């Protein structure tokens, strides 16, 4: 190799090393100063919570289009780790759902180091409102349906159908309440009292979360938390949201909290499944019978109900 060729090769390697070091430095600065973003790519991440809020099942959460706790939390973590993201917009269009899944998402939202603004679209009720109490600010469309602060548990009663079909269920149990919630028989007064106690406990937690997140007196929240829904306008008057507006207004609010000037760029956050994860999700997807059995189990929900 000639001397000129060697010099050219060394120069090329030096340039490549310099580019890598500059990239690493930019990433480090973006991570350390999330409000500054990365270069010109200062963006507001959009994390969507659409449909019923549910607990993830196996690997199927990667294939789900609904608001499973693991998918939403994964999207939040992705936004937190992205150096081009300065703030997060939590887009909520959900009637709520699982008590546990709602609480998991709420904790993830509250724990975000980057500012989070929640935006209420058509409906952000019950669990949809619960998760938003972890955000720094809530922007609601004037005609959104929100509120529905409360807990519900529904048990399918199939005794009449089983009787018509001539099906009987024989149960051997260790205690009188072991089969509480069985669709083959109604609840006893004692079992109803037990279930009511669980509902009341989850309800008190809901009230505490709203009081803390919205900086409202607990007594005031209790007066609002009878399960009714509120429009965005009513919610603003009651202190349940911070402002009325569109999604664009919410993006501007998120950018403002991050110190961004002008209209921020947005970036959709959605965890993508690998080919292996898609295959595993298809294999482990619950069959219809198992899915029906899960619906028959007693459960507590922060959910808008008719």
Language-model-detected regions and their locations in the chain:
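N-terminal organellar transit peptides
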Residues: 1-118, 122-127, 137-141, 152-306
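Extracytoplasmic ligand-binding site segments that recognize negatively charged/polar headgroups
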Residues: 148
